[in-house]
């Protein structure tokens, strides 16, 4: 009998025959826990709108070497139709090139023809650029010449210039950094008087430099925003147990990591109304963690990460991307990639699905969204974000990070606070079988994003699930649901 008990215990989880199984077990005189859906109340407060989400909030970051041709063929090219389509489908409006290799003397600096191909792509994809120049053993005159070329020909696609990448790794003081950085900055300004910049592009270990940078350069009016980097999970190679790694990636404790980093460099910027952006970020550095960064866990993490930083006033995040990335001065597999090259275009990794879902709902200003699970499930790993558009359309994103054998579904009641919300739609992001380790077969609105960038947008009407401003939806474990409601 004990073996039957255990067999039924394993089988009943997430099974549509659960009520019948429970009855049969009861008749046998056994007592099994019944995993029901957890009631959750989400209360929206639109009275005090918060940060407005920038149109180019979700961006990508690449190594500068990606501008170079590979056997005569360019990755970034106006002729690369699948890549252009991927950018358009995901809604990528901010493209940064830099990374470790921008400061590697062993790597070639892009030439003007390389730059022309790159900006041809940017125009075709309708994305704007943060363009980086070499700082480590940099050449002020060469950087200035390239800046003039870019500004003369491609100013409509340019956001700003950045000089160097994570200089705190090889220059160990702000004073030492300034000695190398300012000659390049001055040389560019001499030939491009209206040039705009961002900086200082540091790791998460050197936040005070950001304040020094603001003091010395922001008053000039030439700084678009302060930019920093973050890989909240640390080195990907240290994650040796994928199950534990996915648990870590989805842990509520990661919000504490973000908050700690925020507290170290953002408050003085916020007080002075100085914008900031995470110019390079992802979950684990050195290319990510195997069987963690490349799974559905990263999709849920990505949605949450984007919204957390948007809610804390960031102007955006550029997820580092590529087929391979620089781990220090070596090349490593890019496990945290948003997408990688495939025979017919680009294989879209789970993180891209998170980016796409975010862009479907990130229209307007963030408003209050309070999650209150049932008293018996206070530890439910579900987060909610709400955005109010100028036309009063309300978007509510529900991320149920519960997963694996003990993952709990959520029956959510959303109190919008206004009976005028009488109609709406939902779109769900799911993994096959609710498998948090899934790397393919993901669905957003019932369709996958294909290698050629094609995706069919399909929403589901709420119908009777909305009444008098209250919305009732189910959010299964290991899934994300975006709810969009409009007034009568």
Q: Where do the model's predicted regions map?
A:
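Bacterial N-terminal signal peptides that target proteins for export
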Residues: 8-23
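N-terminal signal peptide c-region/cleavage motif recognized by signal peptidases
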Residues: 31-33
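N-terminal catalytic cores of secreted or lumenal carbohydrate-active enzymes
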Residues: 37-221
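Conserved, mostly hydrophobic/aromatic
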Residues: 60, 95, 166, 226, ...
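Noncatalytic carbohydrate-binding groove/subsite architecture in carbohydrate-active enzymes
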Residues: 140-147, 174-305, 312
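Aromatic/acidic polysaccharide-binding cleft in carbohydrate-active enzymes
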Residues: 278, 282-384, 390
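Carbohydrate-binding surface patches
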Residues: 377-420, 426-435, 478-484
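Acidic, Ser/Thr/Pro-rich beta/coil linker or hinge segments at domain junctions
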Residues: 417-471, 475
């Amino acid at each position: 009998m004990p073996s039957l008990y255990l067999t039924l215990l394993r089988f009943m989880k997430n099974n549509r025959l659960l009520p019948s199984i429970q009855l049969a077990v009861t008749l046998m005189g056994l007592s099994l826990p019944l995993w029901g859906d957890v009631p959750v109340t989400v209360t929206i407060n639109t009275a005090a709108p918060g940060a407005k989400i920038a149109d180019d909030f979700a961006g990508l970051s690449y190594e500068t070497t990606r501008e170079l041709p590979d056997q005569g063929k360019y990755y970034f090219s106006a002729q690369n139709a699948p890549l252009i389509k991927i950018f358009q489908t995901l809604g990528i409006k901010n493209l940064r090139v830099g990374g470790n290799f921008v400061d590697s003397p062993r790597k070639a600096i892009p030439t003007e023809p390389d730059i022309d191909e790159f900006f041809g792509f940017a125009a075709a994809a309708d994305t704007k650029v943060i363009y980086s120049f070499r700082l480590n053993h940099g050449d002020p005159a060469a950087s200035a010449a390239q800046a003039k070329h870019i500004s003369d020909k491609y100013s409509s696609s340019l956001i700003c210039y950045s000089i160097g990448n994570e200089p705190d790794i090889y220059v160990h003081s702000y004073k030492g950094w300034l000695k190398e950085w300012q000659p390049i900055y001055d040389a560019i300004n001499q030939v491009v008087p209206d040039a705009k910049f961002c900086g200082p592009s540091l790791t998460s270990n050197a936040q005070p430099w950001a304040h020094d940078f603001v003091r010395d350069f922001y008053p000039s009016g030439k700084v678009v925003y302060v930019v920093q980097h973050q890989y909240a999970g640390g080195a990907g190679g240290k994650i040796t147990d994928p199950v534990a790694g996915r648990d870590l990636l989805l842990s509520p404790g990661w919000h504490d990591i973000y908050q700690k980093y925020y507290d170290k460099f953002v408050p003085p910027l916020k007080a002075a109304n100085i914008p900031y952006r995470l110019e390079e970020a992802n979950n684990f550095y050195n290319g990510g963690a195997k069987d963690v960064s490349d799974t559905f866990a990263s999709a849920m993490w990505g949605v949450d990460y984007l919204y957390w930083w948007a809610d804390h006033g960031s102007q955006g995040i550029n997820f580092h991307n590529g087929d391979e990335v620089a781990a220090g001065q070596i090349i490593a597999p890019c496990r945290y990639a948003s997408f990688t090259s495939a025979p017919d275009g680009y294989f879209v990794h789970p993180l891209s699905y998170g980016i796409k879902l975010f862009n479907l709902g990130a229209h307007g200003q963030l408003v209050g969204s309070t999650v209150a699970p049932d008293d018996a499930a206070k530890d439910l790993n579900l987060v909610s974000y709400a955005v109010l558009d100028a036309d009063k359309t309300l978007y509510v994103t529900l991320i149920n990070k519960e997963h694996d054998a003990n993952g709990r579904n959520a029956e959510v009641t959303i109190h919008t606070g206004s009976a005028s919300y009488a109609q709406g739609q939902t779109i769900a992001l799911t993994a096959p079988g609710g498998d948090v380790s899934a790397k393919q077969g993901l669905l957003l609105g019932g369709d996958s994003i294909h290698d050629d960038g094609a995706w069919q947008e399909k929403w589901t009407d709420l119908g009777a699930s909305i009444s008098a401003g209250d919305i009732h939806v189910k959010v299964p474990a290991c899934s994300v649901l975006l709810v969009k409601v409009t007034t009568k």
